[in-house]
Amino acid sequence: MRLNHKQGTAGEDAALAFLQSQGCTLLARNWHCAYGEIDLIVKNGGMILFVEVKYRKNQRFGGAAYSISPSKLLKLQRSVEYYLQQNRLTNVPCRLDAVLIEGNRPPEWIKNITG
């Protein structure tokens, strides 16, 4: 297993543990479709959260938040729409979030990354 993949998996594990400590329940992990991948899909109360996880060893090159590009955001939005259609989830409150992990700092939960 490549180092980046191991770090990504460890980052997702940490993000999931953090979200579960905040009351979230896992629905899916590494969900794929033609538009891309959603790292974590969780339920928090009555809301479905689609979560992009970004891990960086340090803040060099802008840190974890900097790595969510406009093209990545578009892929995520299309993936979310596809997930909702495929699962026939209409009129279900949902949100696209990010959990950022940098080095040994606690995870940072950014809610509603689409604005």
Curated annotation (Swiss-Prot):
Disulfide bonds: none annotated. It comes from the Bacteria. SUPFAM superfamilies: Restriction endonuclease-like. Gene3D superfamilies: 3.40.1350.10. It holds the Pfam family UPF0102. One of its GO terms (molecular function) is nucleic acid binding. Belongs to the UPF0102 family. This is UPF0102 protein NGO_1987. It comes from Neisseria gonorrhoeae (strain ATCC 700825 / FA 1090).
